[in-house]
């Protein structure tokens, strides 16, 4: 029987880790490849303290549009996640395929829930970050207007967390 346990070629390693993940690593930005989603979009994870640097670098690679920023809760006792979906937009005549990347930051709900705001890189992250703060309690450091977007300012808790307990009563205020 033949032993097929030879070391993987560098091309196979690149396919496993992802092209963008490998490039970020070569540029000194620690990240973890999470594979590709069902349509082939590469997904990677970075630590909160590396997010701003990673997104700045990705913008330099040509991912010049923040299509979506959001958050989700993996479940009670598990991580809260802030995610970023970036795409590369160029001249509409030259686009053969849209290049996409998704970046995730996993936050332990029992520790610091802060990530850097991307407002200085992508102005469109303003309301998206505010909504994520409002629904999940993830703080965006250096955000220009870190206030609630959908819920009243005096609302307690984060309604889209899976461990959220809905209040029995909340007094509605008249609009006039």
UniProtKB/Swiss-Prot annotation:
GO annotations of cellular component type: plasma membrane-derived thylakoid membrane
InterPro entries: NADH_DH_suC, NADH_quin_OxRdtase_su_C/D-like, NADH_UbQ_OxRdtase_30kDa_su
EC numbers, comma separated: 7.1.1.-
Principal subcellular localisation of the protein: membrane
Topology of this chain in the membrane: Peripheral membrane protein
Keyword vocabulary terms for this entry: Membrane, NAD, NADP, Plastoquinone, Quinone, Thylakoid, Translocase, Transport
GO MF term set: NADH dehydrogenase (ubiquinone) activity; quinone binding
Gene3D superfamilies: NADH:ubiquinone oxidoreductase, 30kDa subunit (3.30.460.80)
Location of this chain's protein in the cell: Cellular thylakoid membrane
GO biological process, one term: photosynthesis, light reaction
Keyword Iron part of the UniProt annotation: no
Catalytic EC class: translocase
Domain of life assignment: Bacteria
Catalytic activity: a plastoquinone + NADH + (n+1) H(+)(in) = a plastoquinol + NAD(+) + n H(+)(out); a plastoquinone + NADPH + (n+1) H(+)(in) = a plastoquinol + NADP(+) + n H(+)(out)
Protein family according to the UniProt entry: Belongs to the complex I 30 kDa subunit family.
Database matches in PANTHER family: NADH DEHYDROGENASE [UBIQUINONE] IRON-SULFUR PROTEIN 3, MITOCHONDRIAL, NADH DEHYDROGENASE UBIQUINONE IRON-SULFUR PROTEIN 3
Described purpose of this protein according to its UniProt entry: NDH-1 shuttles electrons from an unknown electron donor, via FMN and iron-sulfur (Fe-S) centers, to quinones in the respiratory and/or the photosynthetic chain. The immediate electron acceptor for the enzyme in this species is believed to be plastoquinone. Couples the redox reaction to proton translocation, and thus conserves the redox energy in a proton gradient. Cyanobacterial NDH-1 also plays a role in inorganic carbon-concentration.
Subunit structure: NDH-1 can be composed of about 15 different subunits; different subcomplexes with different compositions have been identified which probably have different functions.
Protein known as: NAD(P)H-quinone oxidoreductase subunit J
Species of the source: Prochlorococcus marinus subsp. pastoris (strain CCMP1986 / NIES-2087 / MED4)
Gene: ndhJ
